[in-house]
A protein has these predicted regions:
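N-terminal exported-region signature
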Residues: 1-171
């Protein structure tokens, strides 16, 4: 499910954002994963609310998971530089809980939200998707305020029931 060594740069703005990765690094523990920007991190949370608080030396997250996105608050703009093996998007399904999720975007190229979520839309199983700024994708209203999903970003997604999101390849 993974390919040879590759790299990814994830740019984080000051304040709150949501990030994800398509790279499996040698050490996926959140402390090692974010070691290059440690001094700029205030808080990292997963969709369950489990947190990493560097100032308190508290790691309730453990390892970064390829299928999840993470909310992060930084005290300045910074960049996560990663090297590792690439998760092929079409071979790594995203398992969704009923209700709210924070998902990763595993493709290297941007793709319109309506195409990414097409199967969920056809099943009537997507309520809303939001980016880090709160821009929404509302299929019931045929509204796409997100535009394209972007590599390195994470997205909040609300479903009616548990499901699986399958990404297309980058081709």
């Amino acid at each position: 499910c993974i390919m040879p060594i590759t790299s990814q740069e994830i740019n984080l703005p000051i304040g709150w954002s949501i990030f994800s990765t398509y790279i499996e690094t040698e050490n996926m523990n959140v402390i090692a994963f974010l070691s290059g920007i440690q001094s700029h991190i205030i808080l990292v949370k997963n969709f369950l609310g489990e947190a990493y608080l560097p100032e308190w030396n508290f790691n309730g997250i453990g390892n970064i998971e390829y299928h999840q996105g993470y909310q992060v608050k930084t005290n300045q703009e910074c960049t996560i530089n990663l090297q590792g093996e690439y998760f092929k998007p079409y071979e790594n399904p995203i398992y969704l809980e009923s209700g709210w999720n924070i998902i990763s975007y595993l493709r290297t190229s941007p793709s319109p939200a309506d195409l990414v979520f097409q199967d969920l839309i056809l099943q009537g199983n997507i309520v809303i998707a939001k980016d880090e700024l709160g821009a929404a994708f509302l299929p019931e209203w045929n509204y796409n305020g997100i535009g394209n999903l972007q590599a390195g970003k994470g997205y909040q997604l609300k479903t009616n029931v548990s499901d699986i999101l399958n990404y297309l390849s980058n081709d």
